[in-house]
UniProtKB/Swiss-Prot annotation:
UniProt superkingdom: Bacteria
Record's keyword terms, sorted: Acyltransferase, Amino-acid biosynthesis, Cytoplasm, Diaminopimelate biosynthesis, Lysine biosynthesis, Repeat, Transferase
InterPro entries referenced in this protein's UniProt entry, alphabetically: DapD_Trfase_Hexpep_rpt_fam (IPR005664), Hexapep (IPR001451), Hexapep_transf_CS (IPR018357), THP_succinylTrfase_dom1 (IPR023180), THP_succinylTrfase_N_sf (IPR037133), Trimer_LpxA-like_sf (IPR011004)
Compartment(s) of residence: Cytoplasm
Record-listed substrate binding positions: 107, 144
Originating organism: Cereibacter sphaeroides (strain ATCC 17023 / DSM 158 / JCM 6121 / CCUG 31486 / LMG 2827 / NBRC 12203 / NCIMB 8253 / ATH 2.4.1.) (Rhodobacter sphaeroides)
Family label: Belongs to the transferase hexapeptide repeat family.
Keyword Acyltransferase: yes
Official protein name in the record: 2,3,4,5-tetrahydropyridine-2,6-dicarboxylate N-succinyltransferase
Reaction(s) catalysed (UniProt annotation): (S)-2,3,4,5-tetrahydrodipicolinate + succinyl-CoA + H2O = (S)-2-succinylamino-6-oxoheptanedioate + CoA
Subunit and partners: Homotrimer.
Length: 274
């Protein structure tokens, strides 16, 4: 099926979503499964960059949600001391052997979790972390320990997601567009970027920076206040601004533009990606 045909089938299925069950067969099941497979392989993305803008394939996001209706809950094995889990989404690595790992070309440290329909590109390093459905993690990126990449999130090339970083998903609460971290960004430990916000190329977020759609992003040099997007090449730290009643409220502060000193402190280590 072409992508245009898949889109039409998914949109029709979405309108009739209450009728979809694990017993559903035919074009509806085939379209949902084909879309999830394309997302899993990286040939389709929930969002793709066109020039300077990001285009969201809303139908692909709908397919991720519809996938939940196609399977019943089941026991999933592999836990410590023969423990199990209870879920309806397969691991991306289910049934993988040496050949599949070599073909995929990324490293997955024990106890990392990647759910089916997420794409992991070559050269990625996954420490014990979590990558949810429909996400896209591009080449050379490090997803460090306890970092989470939310549903349908888009992570660019050569990004470093430090320990405990949270990149928000789109499924609950429902978001119009995915959270996006563009190429060559460094996201400091325990930072959170959520609600479909965009961190533009080459930016650095310091430790403990939290950005949602309502977070004020303040340029210290110009005083400009923006929302939802960090400009390319920004260095951002946590800060505060005066509010009513003499109370200061949290904000994110652009303290400078990325320079050689910043790059030397946040460069990726190629030795880890061999």
């Amino acid at each position: 099926m072409s992508y245009s045909a898949l889109e039409a089938a998914i949109e029709a299925a979405w309108e009739a979503r209450e009728t979809i069950t694990p017993a559903t067969k035919g074009e509806t099941r085939e379209a949902i499964e084909a879309t999830l497979e394309a997302l899993d392989k990286g040939s389709l993305r929930v969002a793709e960059k066109r020039g300077a803008d990001w285009h969201v394939n809303q139908w692909a996001k709908k397919a991720v949600l519809l996938g939940f209706r196609l399977k019943d809950m089941e026991v999933q094995t592999g836990g410590p001391q023969a423990g199990t889990w209870w879920d309806k989404v397969d691991s991306k690595f289910a049934q993988w052997g040496e050949a599949q790992w070599k073909a995929a070309g990324f490293r997955a440290v024990p106890n990392c979790v990647v759910r089916r329909s997420a794409y992991i590109a070559r050269g990625v390093v996954l420490m014990p972390s979590f990558v949810n459905l429909g996400a896209y993690v591009d080449e050379g990126t490090m997803v460090d320990t306890w970092a989470t990449v939310g549903s349908c999130a888009q992570i660019g090339k050569n990004v470093h997601l430090s320990g405990g970083v949270g990149i928000g998903g789109v499924l609950e609460p429902m978001q119009a567009g995915p959270t996006i971290i563009e190429d060559n960004c460094f996201i400091g430990a325990r930072s959170e970027v959520v609600e479909g916000c965009i961190v533009r190329e080459g930016s650095v977020l310091g430790m403990g920076v939290f950005i949602g759609k309502s977070t004020k992003i303040v340029d210290r040099e110009t005083g400009e206040v923006m929302y939802g997007e960090v400009p390319a090449g920004s260095v951002v730290v946590a800060g505060s601004m005066p509010s009513k009643g003499g109370v200061n409220l949290y904000c994110a502060v652009i303290v400078k533009r990325v320079d050689a000193q910043t790059r030397s402190k946040t460069s990726i280590n190629e030795l880890l990606r061999d």
